[in-house]
Amino acid sequence: MKKITITDMKKTLIVGTVAYDDIETAKGSSGRVLGGSGTYIALACSHFASHSSVVSVVGGDFEQRHLDLLNKKGIETSSIEIISNGKTFYWKGKYHNDWNKRDTIITEVNVLEKFNPIVSEEFKTPDVAVLGNLHPLVQKSVLDQLKTAPKAIILDTMNFWMDTALEDLKSVIRRVNIIVINDEEAKQLSGKESLLDAAEEIQKFGLKYIIIKKGEHGAMLFGENQHFNL
């Protein structure tokens, strides 16, 4: 894979959750707020990609103002399916004084349980594809719909899928260039305790880059024969 630059991100396909969160901390509660991996990947990409699309699903309770927010940022939302008689994915959690620790209080999968992503014709030839944290088979179905190989495919995943769908996850990882996971997930996926050893083992899937998140301590980027802290 050649070096990716900002100009390569003209057309970016994003698949992930568009959701509602409720977050408690020692300082107070957010109440019901806009959340989801698809949402925040898209908002981040809006600073770089000239044209991006989010593929997701929401319920009839999803507020129009939140779609308007994405649209105002130049993000295509026509591939966000709205199931009028269903409810949007909802997560409530509590963070402790140690921000690396959190408790899940409520998870309501709702319409996401039967999410079947459909990529529009226009975005079957993206420059960059970003696969948010979803079931590996959902991520695979997106890759299967693409007509051309993107310059970069970025995959986010988590320990839950390693516990419940490991072989499916490994199959998808072999088809992407970049993976994003946290330090504990890197150790679990690789079977190694050292992050350096973990990254080296994970690169055997054929990955170009590995991003390992370390909470309040930032992240580490690993490439071929090199790594640095972010």
Residue map of PLM features:
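Positively charged, low-complexity intrinsically disordered leader regions
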Residues: K2-S29
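Structural motif
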Residues: K11-L13, D127-V130, A152, I178
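Conserved N-terminal subdomain of the carbohydrate kinase-like
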Residues: Y20-R32, A49-V130, D144-P150
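Short catalytic helix/loop segments, enriched in acidic residues and glycine
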Residues: G28-L43
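Short beta-strand scaffold segments in enzyme catalytic cores
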Residues: L43, W91-K94, G218-F222
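Short beta->alpha connector loops
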Residues: G59-D61, N133-V138, M158-M162
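Conserved phosphate/ATP/ADP-binding segment of small-molecule kinases
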Residues: K147-A152, W161-N229
